[in-house]
Regions:
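Cell-envelope/extracellular polymer assembly enzymes that use nucleotide-activated donors
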Residues: 12-14
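Short, well-formed alpha-helical segments that are part of the catalytic scaffolds
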Residues: 17-36
Length: 536
């Protein structure tokens, strides 16, 4: 890698990618950066598929290297092929999201300082539409300076050489989005087995005092389902970490994750969480976790205090994997805790203030609409829908659906059905309309009429637990009519109404998204400081 040199007044950008057997995703990655890259370097460690051919077809210079069971060796060899002034690191399967390519190119051309390295946010999409994604800020944009190099067989890092070179670290614009395959269990298993082997090699080399090795080991055991071993590894990582360091916080996240899979260990999990809060008292994720624990145990006063602290003073360590939308999630948790205490007005005020800060948050918009429906406040609900761009005009059929939903929440079934069915006939197929129309029909004992509505709702949210409860209740009712007398079947109809009442307590089942709080961060902690690749 050469020293910084700008040609023709415009810095040259080299994009560097390490690959092995990535034919399914390499083209998409290269397509996302082709317009801004002056050079694309693909370093291949032994692909047996069409990866190299596809890379060349998409404009990359391809170099074949020998995999030495060492990520740093691979990355440093790749760096030696670079001829640009700046290096942007990507992995196969990653791409620059939305307008990020232009933002990064403009930043390099006008604002990037060769005496600095830059963090770029990397995001993993959510596994489904009911969970949050995860993100981390990683050093992905580097000046092409001699002396910058990676260290570590796995979880390789640039930070020692960045510090030695006297470079500052700041944040650049843009977002790198990872492929949904991050959620593939088969892939997690393959990478976990690889990483355990690399950890063992590092330990043989005498590097057993590095907490990052045990963080990687713990992550691997989590993905293999060996939770006892995972907890042991994370405890070791915590013991080896500097107090208050990112490694220690990540160790606590991992240890808490290791308790997620056994409900009998919930109390032990919370003891760990409280210990972690003594070191990291304002960490948002820890506050949400302990607040959820108190909420489960009906200590709503303590839950509210934890959530309120997260909203007002919460901090996020962006250098380790954390949930996306943490401020929005904290406000949602606080609002729900207040609702459970009957403090509806205060809960709505929390959501309104959060929407002022995050006006495009789908989570907050959904919860605010659910909250106003629950209180029967149709006009305020319509205002929130307008604010979120959900309504084309006041004549939008969704307005009728909202009015019907508010009436249904107050158990005014006949006028509710009139509005909801009118909205449906006018073509409204929003989840709000389908959900509340199904609720109204089921509450009136019209299970057969509710079936097509439930089917359409299921196409939008196939895993929604409220929906699945309704479908199961309808199916049970239909079976009852076949095998029982009419009088007995009436009792089964009551089960449908019971299911409706159960979910009507909390419209939208909003609590299910955060109650109990899961801490899945280590499931996506990478095999390296930079990325996951397919080296074996």
């Amino acid at each position: 890698m050469k020293t910084q040199q700008v040609r023709n007044g415009r810095p040259r950008l080299s994009v560097a990618i390490i690959v092995r057997n990535e034919q399914e995703v390499i083209a998409e990655t290269l397509e996302s950066i082709r317009a801004i890259a002056d050079e694309i370097i693909v370093w291949d460690s032994g692909s047996e598929d069409e990866t190299m051919s596809l890379a060349r077809k998409n404009g990359a210079k391809v170099f074949q290297g020998f995999w030495k069971n060492d990520f740093s060796a691979a990355r440093n060899d790749c760096l030696s092929k670079i001829s640009g002034d700046w290096v942007l690191w990507l992995d196969a399967g990653e791409k620059l999201a939305d307008l990020s390519a232009k933002k990064i190119r403009d930043f390099i051309d006008s604002a990037a300082d060769p005496q600095k390295t830059y963090l770029i946010m990397v995001e993993i999409p959510p596994a489904d539409n009911r969970t949050a994604g995860e993100q981390i800020a990683q050093p992905r944009l580097l000046p092409a300076k001699a002396g910058l190099k990676f260290e570590g067989r796995l979880r390789e890092t640039l930070y020692p050489s960045i510090q030695a070179a006297g470079l500052k670290v700041e944040t650049a614009p843009g977002l790198i989005s990872r492929h949904p395959r991050q959620h593939s269990q088969a892939r997690k298993t393959r990478l976990a087995n690889r990483d355990l082997g690399l950890v063992e090699l590092e330990l043989i080399d005498g590097n057993g005092s590095d907490p990052r090795l045990f963080l990687a080991q713990g992550e691997a055991y989590i993905n293999l389902g060996s939770f006892d071993r995972a907890r042991e590894a994370f405890i070791k990582a915590i013991e080896l970490s500097e107090p208050g360091s990112s490694e220690m916080l990540e160790g606590y996240y991992g240890l808490l994750t290791g308790y997620n899979y056994d409900p009998d260990l919930r109390d032990a999990q919370m003891r760990v969480c409280l210990n972690a809060l003594e070191v990291f008292p304002l960490d948002v994720q820890l506050l949400l976790a302990v607040g959820s624990y108190f909420q489960i145990h009906n200590r709503l006063d303590l839950a509210t205090r934890a959530f309120e602290t997260a909203v007002k003073f919460g901090q996020t360590n962006s250098s380790i994997w954390h949930l996306c939308e943490l401020p929005e999630l904290a406000a949602s948790c606080l609002s729900i805790a207040l609702q459970l205490q009957g403090k509806e007005d205060e809960a709505c005020r929390v959501l309104e203030e959060a929407l002022d800060r995050h006006p495009q948050s789908a989570r907050l918009l959904r919860l605010a609409i659910d909250s106003y429906i629950k209180t029967g406040n149709a006009e305020q609900c319509i205002k929130v829908a307008q604010r979120g761009g959900m309504l084309s005009s006041r004549e939008d059929p969704l307005v009728l659906a909202i009015r019907g939903a508010c009436k249904a929440a107050k158990q005014e079934w006949t006028p509710a059905l009139t509005d909801l069915q009118s909205a449906y006939l006018m073509g409204c197929r929003s989840k709000l309309c389908l959900r509340w129309l199904a609720v109204a029909l089921l509450s009136n004992g019209q299970a057969e009429a509710a079936k097509p509505v439930l089917d359409q709702w299921q196409k939008l949210e196939p895993a929604n637990p409220e929906l699945l409860a309704y479908i199961a209740a309808v199916r049970e009712t239909q079976n009852a009519f076949v095998i029982k007398a009419e009088q007995e079947a009436e009792e089964e109809v009551g089960k449908v109404k019971t299911a409706v009442r159960q979910y009507r307590i909390d419209p939208g089942s909003a609590i299910s998204e955060i109650h109990p709080i899961r801490i899945p961060f280590v499931q996506h902690v990478t095999s390296s400081d930079m990325s996951i690749t397919e080296e074996t």
